[in-house]
Structure formats: structure tokens, C-alpha cells
Amino acid sequence: MEAIAKRLDACQEQLLELYEENSTDLNKHVLHWKCMRHESVLLYKAKQMGLSHIGMQVVPPLKVSEAKGHNAIEMQMHLESLLKTEYSMEPWTLQETSYEMWQTPPKRCFKKRGKTVEVKFDGCANNTMDYVVWTDVYVQDTDSWVKVHSMVDAKGIYYTCGQFKTYYVNFVKEAEKYGSTKQWEVCYGSTVICSPASVSSTTQEVSIPESTTYTPAQTSTPVSSSTQEDAVQTPPRKRARGVQQSPCNALCVAHIGPVDSGNHNLITNNHDQHQRRNNSNSSATPIVQFQGESNCLKCFRYRLNDKHRHLFDLISSTWHWASPKAPHKHAIVTVTYHSEEQRQQFLNVVKIPPTIRHKLGFMSLHLL
């Protein structure tokens, strides 16, 4: 057990150093997934030995460690393959090489520079969904990688590799899911593309393959992702504010004013805002809420417990908002303090990795 604990400590320490470094070097991200793979192997072995905890860390079930190990192997292999191409010289972030981004449509492709597309169903401003068009999509073609751009037309969002289109968002299916009239309007920057009557009357005429199937490229009225400016990092799947437009019965392209796609990044360091707040409840507990990728938060929590335990009161496990209306999909760790002075001392001493965002606040709940 002691040998596994030492190896796990060293592995997680290296992971946290990579998170703090926040490198854009692809070699560092290959190393990151090697460490993730090693961590999964150690936890799997610990569970086989009958261990439920290693220090303060809970040992997950065998299936969990096995699945994470397989994911790490998959990511390591694809990144090592990408490392052999000219795209290895481009800057790459941890988020762009994460497993979550790898599984984001279009799946099993690397993606960069996403831009919001808002689709309004049934002509109703309150019935809209947001999707993402990626400026750069890295597709594996036999033994190499090809960089292409995704585009939008009345049928969906797609990218073209060679002479074939791959649709990874099918507006026909989305309209069946979220609407009742099979009509939709695509709002992309200052452009609106409306569903044609032929599309709304029958789905057979625009049968769109899944993202793993290719169809010959056709002439349409696409909108390139490279013409837009408002970028987001991950595809939001929440209800969004609609854009007022007149209904369309045929394929059309209209120009409207700029569309506010919204800033999906979390605001950090709201210290001044909370300082001005009237905290009349003397029993309110000062807190800091950390948000980021689950494994990064786990390693950060381990370091806090190991080296900075005197600078805070309590620390939570990693948790997520369960509501479908949650503003983000980040993992969260909450830390409580005896006083605002202790919290400020914590912030002055502890180095927070740039991949972790934090907010200050108060918790009125009486803690046991």
C-alpha cells in the first residue's frame, strides 16, 4: 500500500504541475494523458488489493478506473499521432485536448475556435437552441490528419473532407426533437437561414447521415465559420434567448443586426462585488467556489489538504449542478473559512492553476 501511495502522490503532483503550467505545447498534453493513464493503473491495482482509500482519496470501483484508463490510452494514441504532423506546431490547450472536447460533436475529432449558432424552432423566440460551428476541425484521414472548417446550411452543420460532407448537427432531427411544425431558422452572426418548405414537409428529401457517414458534397448556401467573430469554447446545450425574425417558408438568407451570442466564460475574482455586499447575517460562512475540469480540481484539492490545511476550514468533494438549466458543465469544489481574513490569507498564499476559475461568496447554511 505504501508503494502505491508514493507512486500515486508523485503522479498527481506531476498532474497538478501540468495544470499550473497551462502549457500550449502538444508534447505536454501527451505527457498529461500518460500521467492520467498511470493514475488509473495505480487506482485499479489498489482496488484489486482491497483498498478503499489511499490517504484521503477514495479508490473508485474497478470499472471506473478501467474506463478512465481506456480513455487515457485513446487520447494518448491520437495525440501522439497528431504530434507527427505539421499541426503539432500549433498552440494546443488542455481543454482542446481533453476527452470531453474529443467527444463533443463532431466526435473523435480535435476542434478549435467554436462559434455559436442559434436555431429557432416553430418561429418561436422562446424555443431556441445553441449549437457550435468550429473554425478548425482536425479529422483523421487514414494515417494522417486533415484540418477543415465546419459550415452551416439549411440542413445542418457539417464539415467537408475531400468530396464528402459529414453532418454532425441535423436540423431535421433537432426540429423533431424540439419543435412541432418542422420549421426552423438558423441565426448565425448577422445571417439568418430559414428551412425550405421541402425540408419541413418531408424528411426523406434531406436525409442526413450520422456524423460517422459521408455523403457527396452538394451545392447549397453554406455560411463559413471563418466569417464570424463571437467565439465560445464548448457547445452550450441550454435554452437561449431568441432572435426576432419573420417566418420563412423557403430557403432564404437575410441580414440582421449583430447577434449577442453571450459570454459563456465564468467571471472570476468577484471579490469587490462581495465586499460591497451587506452581510448582515453574522453566521454567514465565507467561501470560495472553484470551477474547472474534474481531475484538475481533484489534484488541486489534494494539494490543499496536503500543504495548506491551516488556511481553510472545510473542503467539499467534487460536485456538479444537476439541473439541465445549469450555466456550465464544470466540476465544482467549495472551500469554507472561519473568517474573511482567513480567506484572504488563503488567496494570498495559495497558487491557483490558471485552468481553475474561482468565485468568492458566503454560505448562510449552518455547518455541523
From Swiss-Prot:
Keywords: Activator, DNA replication, DNA-binding, Early protein, Host nucleus, Phosphoprotein, Repressor, Transcription, Transcription regulation. GO terms for cellular component: host cell nucleus. One of its GO terms (biological process) is DNA-templated transcription. InterPro entries: E2/EBNA1_C_sf (IPR035975), Nucleotide-bd_a/b_plait_sf (IPR012677), Papillomavirus_E2_C (IPR000427), PPV_E2_N (IPR001866), Reg_prot_E2 (IPR033668), Regulatory_protein_E2_N (IPR036050), Regulatory_protein_E2_N_1 (IPR042503), Regulatory_protein_E2_N_2 (IPR042504). Binds DNA as homodimer. Interacts with protein E1; this interaction greatly increases E1 DNA-binding activity. Interacts with protein L1; this interaction enhances E2-dependent replication and transcription activation. Interacts with protein L2; this interaction inhibits E2 transcriptional activity but not DNA replication function E2. Interacts with protein E7; this interaction inhibits E7 oncogenic activity. Interacts with host TAF1; this interaction modulates E2-dependent transcriptional regulation. Interacts with host BRD4; this interaction mediates E2 transcriptional activation function. Residues 205-231 have a biased composition (Polar residues). Disulfide bonds: none annotated. The keyword Lipid biosynthesis does not apply. This is Regulatory protein E2. The gene is E2. One of its GO terms (molecular function) is nucleotide binding.
